[in-house]
């Protein structure tokens, strides 16, 4: 599998990490299939989601979560748990290359946010997600949309981050075609509605200034909440495993 990033990329990326608040609500909730927030002890696995913010979000909603990533710093996970009032170790974590991972079980919910776009073969990455889902379970994937304003912002202010993304993975019609060939039903692929622009945090004053400017522009963009290639920050995929 040809990855657009490597371990050093992510090690440097997480050197800048500041513990964030695990949300009470997710911006993606409007796109979750019915019943997805009712964990009731069901299992979930987050692909490529270190340090596990969304794993903890689903823990809060009653899931037993597992985090799989090929770069994991346990101290960061523990710090995130502690800073958000969770008991230490409530998220199981597995440090492994996704493409070498051999699961001991299947999961009720398999999800990733901002993962599949870092690889050249999008269909293969999605298929491997689907392979981890129990029959009757849920697949949920979100990826950024860099084919509109957000992509322009990344190209101008953070070309390295832009180049770490496969822009061809961000075409809804192509995604629907890939999903149609997999053992899935109730498949939905959609642009999210609420516009949002962002830059990843980097060290240095220039990045801080650029992020403030982009944040102000993002506030203005929210006046146009229309799902579209130009304005939507994300594409979301949901499906049920047959």
Language-model features: where?
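Conserved N-terminal segment of class I S-adenosyl-L-methionine
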Residues: 1-105, 109, 113, 126, ...
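S-adenosyl-L-methionine-dependent methyltransferase catalytic module, highlighting the catalytic core
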Residues: 17-23, 84, 98-99, 120-131, ...
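Conserved phosphate-binding and hydrolysis motifs of nucleotide-dependent enzymes
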Residues: 48, 136-137
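A short His-aromatic
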Residues: 114-118
């Amino acid at each position: 599998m040809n990855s657009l990033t490597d371990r050093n990329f992510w090690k440097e990326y997480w050197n800048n990490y500041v513990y964030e608040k695990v949300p009470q609500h997710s911006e993606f909730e409007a796109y979750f299939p019915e019943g997805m927030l009712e964990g009731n002890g069901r299992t979930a696995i987050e692909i490529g989601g270190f340090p596990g913010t969304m794993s903890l979000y689903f823990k809060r909603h009653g899931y037993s979560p597992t985090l799989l990533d090929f770069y994991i710093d346990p101290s960061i996970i523990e710090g995130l748990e502690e800073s958000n009032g969770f008991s230490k170790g409530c998220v199981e974590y597995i440090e492994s290359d996704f493409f070498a991972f051999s699961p001991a079980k299947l999961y009720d919910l398999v999800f990733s946010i901002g993962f599949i776009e870092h690889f050249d073969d999008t269909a293969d990455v999605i298929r491997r997600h689907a392979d981890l889902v129990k029959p009757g379970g849920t697949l949920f994937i979100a990826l950024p949309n860099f084919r509109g304003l957000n992509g322009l912002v990344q190209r101008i202010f953070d070309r390295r981050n832009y180049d770490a993304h496969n822009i061809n993975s961000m075409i809804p019609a192509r995604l629907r075609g890939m999903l149609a060939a997999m053992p899935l039903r109730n498949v939905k692929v959609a642009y999210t509605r609420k516009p949002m622009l962002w830059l990843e945090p980097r060290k240095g004053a220039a990045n801080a200034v650029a992020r403030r400017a982009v944040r102000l522009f993002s506030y203005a963009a929210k006046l146009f909440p229309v799902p579209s290639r130009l304005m939507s920050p994300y594409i979301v995929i949901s499906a049920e495993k047959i």
